Curated annotation (Swiss-Prot):
This is NADH dehydrogenase [ubiquinone] 1 alpha subcomplex assembly factor 2. Residues 112-168 are annotated as: Disordered. Belongs to the complex I NDUFA12 subunit family. GO terms for biological process: cilium assembly; mitochondrial respiratory chain complex I assembly; negative regulation of insulin secretion involved in cellular response to glucose stimulus. It is found in: Mitochondrion. Its main location: mitochondrion. The modification Phosphoserine is found at residue 133. Residues 145-157 have a biased composition (Polar residues). GO terms for molecular function: protein-containing complex binding. Keywords: Chaperone, Cilium biogenesis/degradation, Mitochondrion, Phosphoprotein, Transit peptide. Acts as a molecular chaperone for mitochondrial complex I assembly. Complex I functions in the transfer of electrons from NADH to the respiratory chain. The immediate electron acceptor for the enzyme is believed to be ubiquinone. Is involved in the initial steps of cilia formation, including removal of CP110 from the mother centrioles, docking of membrane vesicles to the mother centrioles, and establishment of the transition zone.
Length: 168
């Protein structure tokens, strides 16, 4: 840190009236601060801030899970009070239990599928044509010439000649 940046920081802290209140630290080493609403030297009201000072200072080193969920909720203002260390540890223990239970369930389900596959015969290949609600009796495709008349009339197929319109 250069000498000028130190001078600038001390001048800025004297003018800003921003007072950081240390609220807590998590088990990963991140520090959390609260800055109450205040008026700056120009008379503007600056709203409250909630700040995290990460243990690893580079943004590039950030990975999901570096900030516990409870602290993240406090920073985003979805929770009013900062979490306690006991609460964070209790929730992490609960997440681990859920992970173990889901893994057990997955293994039991996989075992159940293997035994049911042995009991059931393999499905036969079916031919699907048309809409599911319409019965298919092996009808032929429409022919070029129309067939029959009246109620059993089926039109013939049609192909356009060329893209030019005929004028009348």
């Amino acid at each position: 840190m250069s000498w000028w940046s130190g001078v600038w920081r001390s001048v800025w802290s004297a003018l800003s009236r921003e007072v950081r209140e240390h609220v807590g630290t998590d088990h990963l080493g991140n520090k959390y601060y609260y800055v109450a609403e205040y008026k700056n030297w120009r008379g503007q009201t600056i709203r409250e801030k909630r700040i995290v000072e990460a243990a690893n200072r580079k943004e590039v080193d950030y990975e999901a899970g570096d900030i516990p969920t409870e602290w993240e909720a406090w920073i985003r203002r979805t929770r009013k009070t900062p979490p306690t260390m006991e609460e964070i540890l209790k929730n992490e223990k609960y997440r681990e239990e859920i992970k173990i239970k889901s893994q057990d369930f997955y293994e039991k389900d996989k075992l159940g599928k293997e035994t049911s596959e042995e009991l059931l015969p393999s499905p036969t290949a079916t031919q699907v044509k048309g809409h599911a609600s319409a019965p298919y009796f092996g009808r032929e495709e429409p022919s070029v010439a129309p067939t029959s008349t009246g109620k059993t009339f089926q039109p013939g197929s049609w192909t356009p000649e060329d893209g030019k319109r005929q004028s009348q």
